[in-house]
């Protein structure tokens, strides 16, 4: 069995010892696998082309090419090799016309699977062009490359002012610096204006109220007040349409003529609140407390809670003369001792609702569901014309 030492064309370093068998094509296949190239021809140390396997002797030194002419390793015009091995070799990169000097270990060790590591981990493997100073030419943006090189040096992402992080991210993706990509994506996300969905506090809202003239309508549509303490505030005529007021404390608040259409009031406390002329169409007040509230407007303006979800609400002792609760859901609600004179309860779900002690004079209960409802101690008897079924 014969064995030979294979080198890349023009390089006397990092050779591979292989066994010679079969044909010249077999040797080229082995050379391609060992050296990571597409070998097409083999030369001896004197530049002679080997075209027959029989010409190869034991312990020959051969140079493998990818089709380029033979380069004598002793007269190679490339900069001289370092004396301490390739992991400490200094090299210069010409990136977009700007020079960067670093070591192979910097480019290889931090991200061994990156493009830069594959380009420089073995000398001579990468056949890129070099300029007149021997610097490797890389056609990329130097201002975006500098943060990447510094990251490979010390592992910290440092980007100077005025440099777009998106540009650095694209360069990191190009060179395959995976760990840096994660850092950059986080940095870009943190640099964006925050999408603040946190609830508005009482202090912030009071500041809005003080800055708004009393005759101007404050627009709070769709805002998040979840859990806020808005008790005892003057909230007249404010547009809370589709706002999140869940678990809010609105006790003793003045919500006269406020628009709470489709608002979320679930779990909120509105005890003793002034709700004259309030608009609460299709609002969700499930589990809320509305004890001793006043819905009755002396001017005749009626509160509108049509289609509202009032499951399990506690409205005990509230004044609701003329209120519109058409097709609302009051299942398991507590309406003890409420004044519901002239109220519209047509199509309302009153299943298991406690209406004991209520005044339902002239109230419209046509088509309402009163299954399991409690009508004890009524102030006025229900008339057949009210059509309870």
Curated annotation (Swiss-Prot):
Residues 3-82 form the KHA domain. Residues 89-161 form the BTB domain. Pathway: Protein modification; protein ubiquitination. Keywords: Phosphoprotein, Repeat, Ubl conjugation pathway. Residues 224-256, 258-297, 338-376 form the Pentapeptide repeat domain. GO terms for biological process: intracellular signal transduction; protein homooligomerization; protein ubiquitination. It comes from the Eukaryota. Gene3D superfamilies: E3 ubiquitin-protein ligase SopA, Potassium Channel Kv1.1, Chain A. Substrate-specific adapter of a BCR (BTB-CUL3-RBX1) E3 ubiquitin-protein ligase complex, which mediates the ubiquitination of target proteins, leading to their degradation by the proteasome. Forms pentamers. Component of a complex composed of 5 subunits of KCTD9 and 5 CUL3. This is BTB/POZ domain-containing protein KCTD9.
């Amino acid at each position: 069995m014969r064995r030979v030492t294979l080198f890349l064309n023009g390089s006397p370093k990092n050779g591979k010892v292989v066994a010679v068998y079969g044909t010249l094509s077999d040797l080229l296949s082995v050379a391609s696998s060992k050296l990571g190239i597409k070998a097409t021809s083999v030369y001896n140390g004197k530049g002679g082309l080997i075209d027959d396997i029989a010409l190869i002797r034991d312990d020959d030194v051969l140079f493998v090419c990818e089709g380029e002419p033979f380069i004598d390793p002793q007269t190679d015009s490339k900069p001289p090799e370092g004396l301490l091995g390739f992991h400490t070799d200094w090299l210069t990169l010409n990136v977009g016309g700007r020079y960067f000097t670093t070591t192979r270990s910097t480019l290889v060790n931090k991200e061994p699977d990156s493009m830069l590591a594959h380009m420089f981990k073995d000398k001579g493997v990468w056949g890129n062009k070099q300029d007149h100073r021997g610097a490797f030419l890389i056609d990329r943006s130097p201002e975006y490359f500098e943060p990447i090189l510094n990251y490979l040096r010390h592992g910290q992402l440092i980007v100077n002012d005025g440099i777009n992080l998106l540009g650095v991210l694209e360069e990191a993706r190009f060179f395959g610096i995976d760990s840096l990509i994660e850092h950059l994506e986080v940095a870009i996300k943190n640099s964006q204006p925050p999408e603040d969905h946190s609830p508005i506090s009482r202090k912030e809202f009071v500041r809005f109220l003080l800055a708004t003239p009393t005759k101007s309508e404050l627009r709070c549509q769709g805002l998040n007040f979840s859990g806020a303490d808005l008790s005892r505030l003057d909230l007249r005529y404010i547009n809370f349409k589709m706002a999140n007021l869940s678990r809010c404390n609105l006790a003793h608040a003045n919500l006269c003529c406020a628009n709470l259409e489709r608002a979320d009031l679930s779990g909120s406390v509105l005890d003793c609140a002034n709700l004259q002329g309030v608009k609460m169409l299709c609002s969700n007040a499930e589990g809320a407390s509305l004890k001793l509230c006043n819905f009755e407007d002396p001017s005749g303006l009626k509160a509108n809670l049509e289609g509202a979800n009032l499951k399990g609400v506690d409205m005990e002792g509230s004044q609701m003369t003329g209120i519109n609760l058409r097709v609302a859901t009051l299942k398991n609600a507590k309406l003890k001792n409420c004044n519901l004179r002239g109220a519209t309860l047509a199509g309302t779900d009153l299943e298991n609702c406690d209406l004991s002690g209520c005044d339902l004079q002239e109230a419209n209960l046509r088509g309402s569901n009163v299954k399991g409802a409690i009508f004890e101690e009524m102030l006025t008897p229900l008339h057949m014309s009210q059509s309870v079924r």
